[in-house]
From Swiss-Prot:
Phosphate binds at residues 86, 124-126. This is Ribonuclease PH. PANTHER family: EXOSOME COMPLEX COMPONENT, EXOSOME COMPLEX COMPONENT RRP41. PROSITE patterns: RIBONUCLEASE_PH. It catalyses: tRNA(n+1) + phosphate = tRNA(n) + a ribonucleoside 5'-diphosphate. One of its GO terms (biological process) is rRNA processing. Residues 67-87 are annotated as: Disordered. Phosphorolytic 3'-5' exoribonuclease that plays an important role in tRNA 3'-end maturation. Removes nucleotide residues following the 3'-CCA terminus of tRNAs; can also add nucleotides to the ends of RNA molecules by using nucleoside diphosphates as substrates, but this may not be physiologically important. Probably plays a role in initiation of 16S rRNA degradation (leading to ribosome degradation) during starvation.
Amino acid sequence: MRPSGRQPDQLRPVTLTRHYTRHAEGSVLVCFGDTHVLCTASVLPKVPPHKKGSGEGWVTAEYGMLPRSTHTRSDREAARGKQSGRTQEIQRLIGRAMRSVFDLSALGEHTIHLDCDVLQADGGTRTASITGAFVAAHDAISVMRKKGQLTGEPIRDFVAAVSVGVVDGVPVLDLDYPEDASCDTDMNIVMTGAGGFVEVQGTAEGTPFTRTEMDALLGLADHGIRTLIGLQKQALGL
């Protein structure tokens, strides 16, 4: 039995609350159990230097954790004067995940800037961020469409992410913090609605994992992400 009482193939309770803040073109509070992340999508009338004059847009992301989102307070990265390697890795992952399902040429020379701020962390903050950020980006696209800022349909598919791992020899879906801290294997999987893999991040924490275990983890991730994309569609009324 898992610490949470869940079955091996069971997600934590997941909610996606749209229009959570007032000013951003898209905003979503995403909750994977006790992991809560605020995802906002801002539409900016500019693109990075490598896109200027191309007629194409860009989608990028920033990620951060509130000082007391974890058990003990951590300093703000702004106070330290630099971002950690972990923060940089996660925000690049979020950006790649979003761009995998966007037609940038349909955005014109606009940037969708996603901000994912972890309010409370209990494992899986990057996967929750990706899942919530897509819904926020979808709402931002709706605002752009109403304003006539699009040159086509930029969203080609849905995208979501989930963690999987081997805990006490058992492959499980959507690890919370106690499981993440004690697992033998930890993976973060990003997939599209069509079932394509965008990213597979996997690490053995001590005991190498087998091909059989890896196949089981990918199967769990596929099951979980299909459920998450269903919840995204439900939240968007699609």
